[in-house]
Design a protein with these regions (language model features):
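Helix-to-beta-strand junctions that scaffold the AdoMet/dcAdoMet cofactor pocket
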Residues: 161, 210, 236-237
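Conserved AdoMet
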Residues: 32-106
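Mobile active-site "lid"/loop adjacent to the S-adenosyl-L-methionine
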Residues: 193-224
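Non-catalytic accessory regions of SAM-dependent methyltransferases
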Residues: 1-42, 46-49
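Residue-level signal for inorganic ion chemistry
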Residues: 29, 67, 97, 126, ...
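Conserved SAM/SAH cofactor-binding pocket of Class I
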Residues: 95-201
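Conserved Class I SAM-dependent methyltransferase catalytic core
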Residues: 219-281
Length: 284
């Protein structure tokens, strides 16, 4: 079978499965599986596929038709300037989260020797992206999942950042252990912020494949922010900055949580869709 013929069949199958971007998803699966750049993929659509190649591609397209995300199928996701490997313990990085990276790197000189803490690090995408731009910064990422910590360590090594990044399995609610990490100039977090009642209505790509620990934010979606506000004094240095990713229309309630805890609200940042996605607070 010709590559182009199987590709068009794949696009049709994904369209019928109500995949939002069938052509793009099929392109990524085909190019990754065949190790082709975009230009080569276009030029080789007339070539014959081997039986093994065709079988493998059909298998992967079937998985996508069952709403497994492309990133889960190929085991990686591009985020900021890097590629991050994923496993079942890590949230699939979203483009919206790059808003947090943009906010931090605009606030600090590239050569600034800042110390960064990432609460709930997952794949390590936030911390590692920041360390990539802030070339003299060092950081620690914590996660309650040992599997996520192991994945973050692998990503640090793969992206040449392991000399400045440390990942440890810690629950941010454990103040005693958290306090032993020392104080940081910058703390970042993309905590779970989806209300429990909203989980069932999420897309299959999210509710069936992202870890529930990384999604569910309690009854009102604010539980993690309350927990973080309680332990933040243990890790954020005086005058330090806390950057929090938030869900849609949550800004006023999250501001209230942290300002009542003594933190000064500084700025809000919108994502590409115009939604307020990140809040910045300063430690007294």
């Amino acid at each position: 079978m010709k590559l182009g013929e199987l590709f068009e069949q794949a696009v049709e199958e994904l369209s019928k499965a109500k995949v939002e971007t069938p052509r793009l998803d099929a392109e990524i699966l085909f190019m990754d599986t065949l190790s082709l750049a975009k230009s080569d993929f276009v030029l080789q659509k007339s070539r014959d596929l081997s039986d093994d190649e065709a079988a493998k591609l059909k298998e992967l397209v079937d998985l996508r038709a069952k709403r497994m995300p492309v990133s889960r199928i190929i085991g990686k996701r591009g985020f900021w300037k890097y590629t991050f490997a994923l496993n079942e313990n890590t949230l699939d990085p979203r483009a919206d989260s790059e808003t947090l990276i943009e906010a931090v790197v605009k606030d600090y000189d590239k050569a600034a020797k800042v110390r960064i803490l990432d609460l709930g690090t997952g794949s390590g995408c936030l911390l590692l992206s920041l360390l990539g731009d802030l070339v003299n910064a060092k950081g620690v990422g914590i996660d309650t999942s040992v599997g996520a910590v192991d994945m973050a360590k692998e990503n640090a090594e793969a992206n040449g950042l392991s000399d400045r990044a440390t990942f440890v399995p810690v629950d941010w609610r454990d103040g005693e252990i958290l306090g032993n990490l020392g104080k940081f100039d910058v703390v970042v977090a993309n905590p779970p912020y989806i209300p429990l009642a909203d989980i069932e209505g999420l897309k299959p790509e999210v509710k069936d494949y992202d870890p529930m620990l990384a999604l569910a934010g309690g009854d009102d979606g604010l539980l993690s922010y309350r927990q973080i506000a309680m332990v933040l004094p243990l890790v954020l240095d005086a005058g330090g900055a806390f950057y929090a990713e938030i869900g849609k229309d949550k800004e006023e309630r999250v501001k209230e949580i942290f300002t009542k805890s003594g933190y000064a609200f500084k700025k809000e940042y919108k994502d590409l869709g115009g939604i307020i996605r990140v809040l910045k607070f300063l430690s007294p």
